[in-house]
Design a protein with these regions (language model features):
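A secondary-structure boundary/capping signal
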Residues: 59, 73-75, 96-97, 145-147, ...
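Catalytic core of membrane glycerolipid acyltransferases/transacylases, capturing the structured
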Residues: 19-29, 34-37, 50, 65-122
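N-terminal membrane-anchoring alpha-helices
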Residues: 1-56
Length: 247
């Protein structure tokens, strides 16, 4: 096990407790505040610094121009949302899997800072759609992983429709984004943490103005194509820099 593992999780738990306490002290209904966004960004920075993750991001201009928007990304690691929460210049809410909300400390903290719980076993997604619509109307952006799970080998899988249904319903842009490197720092299904570099690339926004739910499949495939293209470029760039093949 890497020496970074225990210090990283210790720092993460302490930062989570601190944010949960601060949000609770501020009282109910404050998850929408700019102060909460700053606390979340600080929380993510603590995790990344402890893990030794060095993050670079391209395409920030696409994000600033599109907000509020739905950011959709490939999913390599549990570290991915932490990277996005720290690196993106957005008031960001994450569509997070139900299992994360069941973890001691993390679940209550996620709810307090306004993250949206997604239960794949539930047949009724209306509550998710309503929460997402409220956040977008309030000026927040959403981060979603259309693959629905992390990829064990970095290969980008098929996309589900949920994020695209939400974007069209609220008539906000989709911003495709690719991430690479997190699977080496915190491999999926494992707890060991290793220092490393992470690259993120945001592509041009896909507008949804005038689109209907009949356009979901086309929008989904356009986003997936953009993410796959951006991801290939990230893999090539990081491989050439390290002099070895990245995957």
């Amino acid at each position: 096990m890497s020496w970074r593992t225990v210090p990283t999780f210790a720092a993460g738990v302490l930062a989570t407790l601190a944010v949960a306490l601060l949000v609770r002290c501020r009282g109910p209904g404050r998850a929408d505040s700019a102060a909460t966004d700053r606390m979340v960004r600080w929380w993510a920075a603590v995790w990344l610094r402890a893990a030794g993750a060095r993050v670079a991001i391209d395409g920030l201009e696409h994000l600033r121009a599109a907000a509020p928007c739905v950011v959709v990304s490939n999913h390599q690691s549990n570290l991915d949302p932490i990277v996005y929460l720290q690196a993106l210049p957005l008031s960001l809410r994450v569509l997070a899997m139900h299992d994360l909300f069941r973890i001691w400390v993390f679940g209550p903290a996620l709810r307090m800072i306004g993250m949206i719980e997604v239960d794949r076993e539930s047949p009724d997604f209306r509550q998710i759609d309503q929460a997402a619509a409220r956040d977008l109307a309030a000026g927040h952006s959403l981060l979603a992983y259309p693959e629905g799970t992390t990829s064990p080998d970095g290969t980008i899988g098929g996309f589900k429709d949920g994020a695209f249904i939400i974007a069209i319903a609220s008539q906000v842009p989709i911003v495709p984004a690719a991430i690479h490197g997190t699977c080496r720092i915190w491999p999926p299904g494992r707890s060991a943490i290793h220092a490393g570099r992470v690259r993120v690339a945001a592509a041009s926004p896909l507008q949804t103005t005038g689109l209907t739910q009949h356009d979901v499949a086309r929008l989904r495939e356009l986003a997936r194509d953009a993410i796959c293209s951006a991801h290939r470029e990230l893999v090539t760039a990081m491989s050439s820099r390290t002099g070895r093949r990245a995957h």
